[in-house]
């Protein structure tokens, strides 16, 4: 799925040796499927690994990628390029800007789930969080649930109103209201 050159793997192993035990690597993408798509690489402490992550094994470390964005990282290459000035990691992701959402979904729920995965979750995943659609009732009320860094976060009211609800209401005329049914518990997993 993600081809990491031998030099880049050695570089990651060296970097990880200076990090807390069980820290791994995360490859992420922001705004996938859009002209503004950007990929990145970051350290992934053990407490930031999510159930929605896919684990990829390399020589001496693991790479974690959110399963909802993995298709955008198909045939990606991470390399360590060295020149006269120094060395730099490069990440080339040929499918990062592909719009896979053009596939026709049969139901409103499927369309909303796809929208959340493509438009909202990549932003939330930068803070270790995600949102899932639980159901849409006959009155157009969408019930959602936050997890990871969003669960118990003191900014969740703002995230719900300014990010999730505003975007869902403007994108889907059938949705009249968004309801958060998460049982929020503030803890170490919470972003704020």
Swiss-Prot record:
[4Fe-4S] cluster binds at residues 150, 153. Keywords: 4Fe-4S, Iron, Iron-sulfur, Metal-binding. InterPro entries: Fe/S_biogenesis_protein_NfuA (IPR017726), FeS_biogenesis (IPR000361), FSCA_dom_sf (IPR034904), HesB-like_dom_sf (IPR035903), NIF_FeS_clus_asmbl_NifU_C (IPR001075). Binds 1 [4Fe-4S] cluster per subunit. The cluster is presumably bound at the interface of two monomers. GO terms for molecular function: 4 iron, 4 sulfur cluster binding; iron ion binding. Its cofactor is [4Fe-4S] cluster. GO terms for biological process: iron-sulfur cluster assembly; protein maturation. SUPFAM superfamilies: Fe-S cluster assembly (FSCA) domain-like (SSF117916), HesB-like domain (SSF89360). Homodimer. Belongs to the NfuA family. Involved in iron-sulfur cluster biogenesis. Binds a 4Fe-4S cluster, can transfer this cluster to apoproteins, and thereby intervenes in the maturation of Fe/S proteins. Could also act as a scaffold/chaperone for damaged Fe/S proteins. This is Fe/S biogenesis protein NfuA. It comes from Buchnera aphidicola subsp. Acyrthosiphon pisum (strain 5A). The lineage of its organism: Bacteria, Pseudomonadati, Pseudomonadota, Gammaproteobacteria, Enterobacterales. The gene is nfuA.
């Amino acid at each position: 799925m993600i081809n990491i050159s031998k030099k880049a793997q050695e570089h990651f192993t060296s970097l990880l040796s200076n990090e807390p035990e069980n820290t791994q690597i995360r490859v992420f993408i922001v705004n996938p499927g859009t002209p503004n798509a950007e990929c990145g690489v970051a350290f992934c402490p053990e407490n930031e690994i999510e159930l929605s992550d896919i684990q990829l094994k390399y020589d001496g470390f693991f790479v974690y990628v959110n399963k909802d964005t993995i298709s955008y990282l198909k045939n990606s290459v991470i390399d360590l390029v060295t020149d006269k000035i120094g060395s730099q990691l490069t990440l080339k992701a040929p499918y990062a800007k592909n719009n896979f959402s053009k596939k026709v979904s049969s139901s409103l729920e499927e369309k909303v789930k796809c929208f959340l995965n493509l438009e909202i979750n990549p932003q939330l995943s930068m803070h270790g969080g995600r949102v899932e659609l639980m159901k849409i009732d006959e009155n157009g009320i969408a019930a959602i649930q936050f997890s990871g860094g969003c669960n118990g976060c003191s900014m969740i009211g703002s995230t719900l109103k300014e990010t999730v609800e505003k975007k869902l209401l403007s994108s889907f005329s059938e949705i009249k209201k968004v309801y958060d049914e998460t049982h929020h518990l503030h803890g170490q997993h919470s972003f704020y």
